[in-house]
């Protein structure tokens, strides 16, 4: 994820770093609304193969899924899908497994075509929907509802607690988004 890439790039300046990921690219959790309504546009900015990060040139990447960690031996076991199990020793273990609340998060090992297929499947489901319910009045929920509504062709309902979405935001912003969502 975003944090794992940042940590790896910083540590690679002074340490030997091995990055282990179930995907060969950064699949950012940013801009969910754009991801759902404009997957091709989202992909250009938020699906970035690790090889495009110059600061990761010094990081050895392993494409696979960690199946176990032996804290006493300081080793992780990695299932590399088609290449078998690898044992990676470490001096310091940094765990940056990403946010667990996103619907796109899972621990399957994927290649870029599988990620593209998943994006296309979600886009097709949304395109075919007559009505979409978005639950959550925070920034992500509001962004998703706004992006879906602006795309058109679908009735979008935003469900949130409280009188208006974006609790804690300035009242002017809250009024603006309510007007925008109603239009």
Per-region residue spans from a language model:
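Conserved N-terminal glycine/acidic-rich loop preference
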Residues: 2-3, 25-42, 109-122, 129, ...
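Beta1-alpha1 glycine-rich phosphate/pyrophosphate-binding loop at the start
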Residues: 1-60, 146-172
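Short glycine-/small-residue-rich flexible loop motifs, especially phosphate/cofactor-binding loops
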Residues: 51, 91, 178
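Alpha-helical segments flanking ligand/cofactor-binding loops in enzyme cores
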Residues: 9, 124, 146, 178-179
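Glycine-rich Rossmann-fold phosphate-binding loop(s) that bind the pyrophosphate
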Residues: 1-2, 135-138
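FAD-binding core/adjacent interface of flavoenzyme oxidoreductases
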Residues: 56-133
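Glycine/Thr-rich phosphate-binding loops of Rossmann-like dinucleotide-binding domains
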Residues: 103-104, 143, 166
């Amino acid at each position: 994820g975003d944090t794992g890439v940042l940590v790896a790039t910083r540590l690679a300046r002074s340490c030997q770093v091995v990055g282990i990921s179930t995907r060969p690219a950064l699949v950012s959790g940013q801009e969910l609304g754009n991801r759902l309504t404009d997957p091709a546009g989202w992909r250009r900015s938020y699906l970035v193969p690790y090889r495009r990060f110059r600061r990761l040139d010094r990081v050895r990447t392993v494409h696979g899924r960690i199946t176990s960690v032996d804290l006493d031996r300081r080793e992780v076991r990695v299932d590399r899908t088609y290449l078998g199990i690898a044992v990676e020793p470490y001096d310091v273990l940094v765990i940056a497994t990403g946010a667990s609340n996103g619907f796109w998060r899972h621990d399957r090992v994927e290649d870029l075509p599988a990620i593209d297929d998943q994006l296309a499947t979600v886009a097709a489901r949304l395109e075919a929907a007559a009505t979409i319910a978005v639950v959550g009045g925070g920034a992500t929920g509001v962004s998703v509802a706004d992006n879906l509504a602006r795309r058109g062709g679908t009735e979008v309902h935003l469900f949130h607690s409280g009188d208006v979405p974006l609790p804690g935001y300035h009242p002017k912003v809250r009024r603006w988004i309510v007007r925008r969502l109603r239009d």
